[in-house]
Amino acid sequence: MMKIALCQMSNSGSVSENLKKSIKAIERAAADGAQLILFPEVQLTEFFPQYPGQDVAHYRIERDSPVIKAFCDAARDNHIMAVPNVYLCENGKPYDASLLIDSDGDIIGRAHV
């Protein structure tokens, strides 16, 4: 049987602050024996969909960004699968995405939300 951790977190407008919270949640979940951790929608930002018309371009994250690498490294270092949700930008097009990162730190799946 797989132990799954669900992360509920209070987000701010600071990507770096929310990333630190997310990495700590990965570490905590792994220490508690979870094999998979799931995160809330757009976890690295304030929940901007509730503010229509707001400029959110600064929240875009490229797939090869240090932020994504930090999630991959944390999953690998803690031997846990992780599903972060980010405002990803590929080919100039932003979208809400959940990434499936395996315990080796590799992105093995992606879902547009």
Predicted ranges, named:
Residues 1-5:
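Extreme N-terminal starter segment of soluble prokaryotic enzymes
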Residues 6-8, 84:
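Structural signal for conserved beta-strand scaffold positions within catalytic alpha/beta enzyme cores
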Residues 8-14:
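Short polar catalytic/cofactor-binding loops
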Residues 15, 24-104:
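Cys-nucleophile CN-hydrolase/nitrilase-fold catalytic domain and related Cys-dependent amidase chemistry
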Residues 111-113:
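Conserved small/polar residues in nucleotide/adenosyl-binding loops
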